[in-house]
């Protein structure tokens, strides 16, 4: 079964997603709650969502919050020999992770698959064939960053006018405006 892949990211106007292993902007509590809700809520009873992230993204999560709870966590790394403490699975590449999800032990347990970073993992996911959705929080100002989100190819990805459970109006926290967008590529 080929499942749709979902990427979720918050990105500043200059496409920044990280700085020194953290977000370039101050903590936006409601934006974080949106991330938690979207990546955790399964639409199928008895199944869990699964999150895939690179090694640096994993270690950027405060230890007390690892693994991301109520989700199956896969960490990608070519260097690590075993899953980092708290992670459920380790895979060498996104392709390997996607194959792992279709193995009998996981196939029946997984509902939605979410890619949660970082840059190279997003890039690889966005170039995958097939059905992809990008859940993008547009932080409506620039922040100094050292990690960036790949350009969204609007020939392939269509911005959806609305999406269930996603607010369409501009949000504001700590004087920072942002809005939620959903892009889709049918593959």
Swiss-Prot record:
InterPro entries: DHFR (IPR012259), DHFR-like_dom_sf (IPR024072), DHFR_CS (IPR017925), DHFR_dom (IPR001796). One of its GO terms (cellular component) is cytoplasm. Methotrexate binds at residue 137. Keywords: Acetylation, Cytoplasm, Methotrexate resistance, Mitochondrion, NADP, One-carbon metabolism, Oxidoreductase, RNA-binding. Its EC number is 1.5.1.3. Pathway: Cofactor biosynthesis; tetrahydrofolate biosynthesis; 5,6,7,8-tetrahydrofolate from 7,8-dihydrofolate: step 1/1. It catalyses: (6S)-5,6,7,8-tetrahydrofolate + NADP(+) = 7,8-dihydrofolate + NADPH + H(+). The modification N6-acetyllysine is found at residue 33. GO terms for molecular function: dihydrofolate reductase activity; mRNA binding; NADP binding. Homodimer. Belongs to the dihydrofolate reductase family. This is Dihydrofolate reductase. It comes from Mesocricetus auratus.
């Amino acid at each position: 079964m080929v499942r749709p892949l979902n990427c979720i990211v918050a990105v500043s106007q200059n496409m920044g997603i990280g700085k020194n292993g953290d977000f370039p902007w101050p903590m936006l509590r409601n934006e974080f709650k949106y991330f938690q809700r979207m990546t955790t809520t399964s639409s199928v009873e008895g199944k869990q969502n699964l999150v895939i992230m690179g090694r640096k993204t994993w270690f950027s999560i405060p230890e007390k919050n690892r693994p991301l709870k109520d989700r199956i966590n896969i960490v990608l790394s070519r260097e690590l020999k075993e899953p980092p403490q708290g992670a459920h699975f380790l895979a060498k590449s996104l392709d390997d992770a996607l194959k792992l999800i279709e193995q009998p032990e996981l196939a029946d347990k997984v509902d939605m698959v979410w890619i949660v970073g970082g840059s190279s993992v997003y890039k690889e996911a966005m170039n995958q064939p097939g059905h992809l959705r990008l859940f993008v929080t547009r932080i409506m100002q620039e922040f100094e960053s050292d990690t960036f989100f790949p350009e969204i190819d609007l020939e392939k990805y269509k911005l959806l006018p609305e999406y269930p459970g996603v607010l369409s109006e501009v949000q504001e926290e700590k004087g920072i405006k942002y809005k939620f967008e959903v892009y889709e590529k049918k593959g």
